[in-house]
Amino acid sequence: MIEGKTLRSDLQHLSRALRTLHKALLDVETQYFGNVGSALEHLQLVTSHPHFAWLQKLSGIISTLDECLDDEEALVVDLERRFRAEVEGLVGPLPASDEDFRQRYNAMLHDSPDVAMAHGALRKVLAQLPAAPAD
């Protein structure tokens, strides 16, 4: 089942690239926010404070992707296309699925070299996945 192994491997690469990007975005947002206190207080802020709310879309994609990786039956051929389209709707180049996310994301791309590097790595991973057919 080489195709299944390739599918799993491709999605694992995507998951890692998304987590790296997510961490870079959280680090920058945390700097913008200011002192957050303990790790527990930081976690509470990230999950419930409006300042970090825009990142929840990306968190949700990562969570869904990781759930699919844990469920062998969820690994279906179209999954790569679906996740590629979903991610590209957030970070580009597809039209924005969430305009607020896209604006904040683009600002961070310009403000943070770490975000820009993580974005570049993510784009390389996405380029390896099949694209959705053109309408």
Residue ranges and their predicted role:
Residues 1-135:
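Surface-exposed peri-terminal alpha-helical interaction modules
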